[in-house]
Amino acid sequence: MVLSLSPGPAPISEVEFFRKFAQMWRISDDFWDSWPSLKEQFARAAAWAPLSKPGAWPDADMLPLGKIGDPDDRGSRRWTNLTRDEQVTLMTLWSMMRSPLIFGGDLPANDAFTLSLLTNPEVLEVDQRSSGNHQAYQSASMIAWVADAPNAKDKYVALFNLSDQEQNVSVAFSELQIPVAKASMRNLWEHKDLGSADHTSAKLPAHGAALFRATVN
């Protein structure tokens, strides 16, 4: 049996209470499919992620992806208002903070893109098996997260573009407190090896994200 405390927001000062009596708890009020709502989750995720542990999970709420209902819950169905780039950002942030992944849409109505978001094994491994997850860098328009891969040597690195314009982002490993000179980079959303580097970089669309595995050489 799983006890999920909902809705939120759960006060972070009561984390020991939640860990003792529940397996998951909502970190926010109902999360819906809008960029302002998604952007607000970054600060909550950063605060809660270091406090998660097996059997006690901060919950960023269900995934409003694919064909979903409206807040009035009168049976109407529509496609999510999040752009495809924002949907990638949502899945990347939820996975990097190790939130429970609970689909909030009409599963039989999924299109190929929505299904690809939910079934990417390399991304799901981040949510299910990473550790040490935390926000490692923030500027006015960009955020980076870092986590340990299961073997404790490799790192997962996520880059997020919070701005309304496309931008090229680059962060040195030293800025992310990754103590290696170089690593072999792999883009987990694109299933593409990128070669060796001493930094993480990507051209990110507005509100977009990228997720990498850095394998220590």
Region locations from a protein language model:
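Catalytic cores of secreted or luminal carbohydrate-active enzymes
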Residues: T89-Y137
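Hydrophobic, well-ordered secondary-structure elements that form the walls
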Residues: V157, M185, H207
